[in-house]
């Protein structure tokens, strides 16, 4: 970052120093000024004041290039007025259509701007100011600030500017107070809107969580119901299969009992037949014995 020294009075420093007027220093800072003007050459010093700034280059050609490239440029919604510090502009526009510095960016600029003008006004003499033409009745167009030049005494100018500065400062103080109140109200409204949005988001999140829990519970209940129904079906199936097996076993047992009864009957018949045959043989033997006797 460049130094803050921009008040050297040697001819080389004067010719390589750039004055930047009508600068919105409420927004534009020293780093911003250095970033804008460093593209024209090495910056030896940079100082930012209320409403204006100085940029000190190492070489005069760099300063002239910066004046040619940046004069009349729009910086932070204001058209800047740029010239060499050693060559102030004689006439800075139409006095009938210009806006005061207090209306554009605050009354404190008048004091600092005129101090700079008085600082260099004592070293150089300029022709008297040209009388302004009649004011235009059409739309007022803002133009560059007109610099008052002449061979008047510094005491008279400083006294006049201090009075105008006091009047402008009271007006700007009221304007700033109103602006601060308006900004405060807007910020309060924005905060209320943000709070309401956050509350709505929290409600939506709670509803989503509640719905998710309900869906999860419903799914678990469905799973339990399906599992219990499956178990019931399996149990019924097993009971039906078990009953069929029991009936089959009972049928087998009945068949076995019938078979055993039939076998016993057959054995008894066979025994009866054998017994009858033995009795027949005994009868025949007795008959034969009687015949022999």
UniProtKB/Swiss-Prot annotation:
<dbReference type="GO" id="GO:0005634">
    <property type="term" value="C:nucleus"/>
</dbReference>
<feature type="compositionally biased region" description="Acidic residues">
    <location>
        <begin position="242"/>
        <end position="263"/>
    </location>
</feature>
<dbReference type="InterPro" id="IPR000504">
    <property type="entry name" value="RRM_dom"/>
</dbReference>
<feature type="coiled-coil region">
    <location>
        <begin position="177"/>
        <end position="208"/>
    </location>
</feature>
<protein>
    <recommendedName>
        <fullName>Heterogeneous nuclear ribonucleoprotein C-like 3</fullName>
    </recommendedName>
</protein>
<dbReference type="InterPro" id="IPR035979">
    <property type="entry name" value="RBD_domain_sf"/>
</dbReference>
<feature type="compositionally biased region" description="Basic and acidic residues">
    <location>
        <begin position="208"/>
        <end position="222"/>
    </location>
</feature>
<keyword id="KW-0539">Nucleus</keyword>
<dbReference type="Pfam" id="PF00076">
    <property type="entry name" value="RRM_1"/>
</dbReference>
<feature type="region of interest" description="Disordered">
    <location>
        <begin position="208"/>
        <end position="293"/>
    </location>
</feature>
<feature type="domain" description="RRM">
    <location>
        <begin position="16"/>
        <end position="87"/>
    </location>
</feature>
<dbReference type="InterPro" id="IPR051186">
    <property type="entry name" value="RRM_HNRPC/RALY_subfam"/>
</dbReference>
<dbReference type="GO" id="GO:0003723">
    <property type="term" value="F:RNA binding"/>
</dbReference>
<dbReference type="InterPro" id="IPR017347">
    <property type="entry name" value="hnRNP_C"/>
</dbReference>
<feature type="compositionally biased region" description="Basic and acidic residues">
    <location>
        <begin position="229"/>
        <end position="240"/>
    </location>
</feature>
<feature type="compositionally biased region" description="Basic and acidic residues">
    <location>
        <begin position="269"/>
        <end position="293"/>
    </location>
</feature>
<keyword id="KW-0175">Coiled coil</keyword>
<keyword id="KW-0694">RNA-binding</keyword>
<dbReference type="InterPro" id="IPR012677">
    <property type="entry name" value="Nucleotide-bd_a/b_plait_sf"/>
</dbReference>
<feature type="region of interest" description="Disordered">
    <location>
        <begin position="140"/>
        <end position="177"/>
    </location>
</feature>
<comment type="similarity">
    <text>Belongs to the RRM HNRPC family. RALY subfamily.</text>
</comment>
């Amino acid at each position: 970052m460049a130094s803050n020294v921009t008040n050297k009075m040697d001819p080389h420093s004067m010719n390589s120093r750039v004055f930047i007027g009508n600068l919105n220093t409420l927004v534009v800072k020293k780093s911003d000024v250095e970033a804008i003007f460093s593209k024209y050459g090495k910056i030896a010093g940079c100082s930012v004041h209320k409403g204006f700034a100085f940029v000190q280059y190492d070489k005069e050609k760099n300063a002239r290039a910066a004046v040619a490239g940046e004069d009349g440029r729009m910086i932070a919604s204001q058209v800047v007025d740029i010239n060499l510090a050693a060559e102030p502009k004689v006439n800075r526009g139409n006095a009938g259509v210009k806006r005061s510095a207090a209306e554009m960016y605050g009354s404190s600029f008048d004091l600092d701007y005129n101090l700079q003008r008085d600082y260099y006004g004592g070293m150089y003499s300029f022709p008297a100011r040209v009388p302004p033409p009649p004011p235009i009745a059409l739309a007022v167009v803002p133009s560059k600030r007109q610099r008052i030049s002449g061979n008047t005494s510094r005491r008279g100018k400083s006294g006049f500017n201090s009075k105008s500065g006091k009047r402008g400062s009271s007006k700007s103080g009221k304007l700033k107070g109103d602006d601060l109140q308006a900004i405060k109200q807007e910020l309060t409204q924005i905060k209320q809107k943000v709070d309401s949005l956050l509350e709505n988001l929290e409600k939506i999140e709670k509803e989503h969580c509640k719905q998710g829990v309900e869906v999860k519970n419903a799914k678990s209940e469905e799973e339990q119901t399906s599992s219990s129904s499956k178990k019931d079906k399996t149990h019924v199936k097993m009971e039906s299969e078990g009953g069929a097996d029991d009936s089959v076993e009972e049928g087998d047992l009945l068949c076995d009992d019938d078979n055993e009864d039939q076998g016993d009957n057959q054995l008894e018949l066979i025994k009866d037949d054998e017994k009858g045959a033995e009795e027949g043989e005994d009868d025949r033997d007795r008959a034969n014995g009687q015949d022999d006797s």
